[in-house]
Regions:
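Positively charged n-region of N-terminal signal peptides that target proteins for export
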Residues: 1-4
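Sec-dependent N-terminal signal peptides
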Residues: 6-11
């Protein structure tokens, strides 16, 4: 039920926000104009874990274009996110964000990594049941991303009562069927994280994902 609520709430957010930008939004982010805002300026109590600024992601390296551990959105999307956040806080939850605006340089980095089939540094953590050259075919990686418009974000819910993230069926950037919005079966433990050890945060940079 919680997963369904989040999906509906964020679908409403994106339906509202996508009317505001298109390609111009990405260009505005690049030139530093006011079309984009820092999410924490609008939703100050949001939790940020910008995975692509660090090395614990499916590539295993900081992603090109991620110069700071910040998250940007178009103003309209951020205002809509604030409304969602306020509703969730009343129910005892906070938003935790992994990614928002994604520069095209970052998308290009994913594509290059996807073509380097020998680089499987993070396979056991993010795609243990997938062959790497299937990631394009299954649409886990693409040459263009809705994130680059600045009105898309990746997030989860943080339960303020338990001080834990809500189980969404799979970890962030899990390349598997458990990540699909219509997944209804009981997820395998490996997809949810608790039985899968995390690698050290100081991983060596991969040679160099997601839509």
């Amino acid at each position: 039920m919680r997963k369904t609520f989040l999906f509906i709430a964020m679908a409403a957010l994106l339906a509202t926000a996508c009317n505001s930008g298109g390609k111009n939004a990405a260009e505005s982010a690049a030139d530093g104009s006011q079309a984009f805002v820092n999410i924490t300026d609008v939703v100050p109590d949001v939790i940020l874990e910008v995975r692509y600024f660090g090395t614990y992601n499916f590539v295993g390296a900081r992603i090109d274009g991620y110069l700071q551990p910040t998250a940007l959105l178009t103003r309209q999307a951020a205002d809509s996110l604030k409304a969602v956040s306020d509703d969730l806080k009343a129910q005892g939850y906070r938003l935790k964000i992994y990614d928002a605006y994604r520069p095209q340089r970052g998308v290009d980095h994913f594509v290059r990594w996807g073509k380097e089939l020998d680089d499987t540094l993070m396979k056991r953590y993010f795609y243990p049941n997938e062959v790497k050259d299937s990631l394009f075919i299954k649409d886990y990686i693409a040459e263009h991303s809705g994130h680059s418009r600045g009105s898309t974000l990746d997030l989860t819910l943080f339960d303020m009562r338990t001080e834990k993230e809500v189980d969404m069926g799979g970890t962030f950037d899990w390349f598997g069927s458990e990540s699909h919005p219509d997944w209804a079966a009981t997820p395998r433990p490996v997809a949810t994280g608790p039985t899968t050890p995390s690698p050290p945060r100081s991983l060596p940079t991969a040679r160099c994902c997601a839509k």
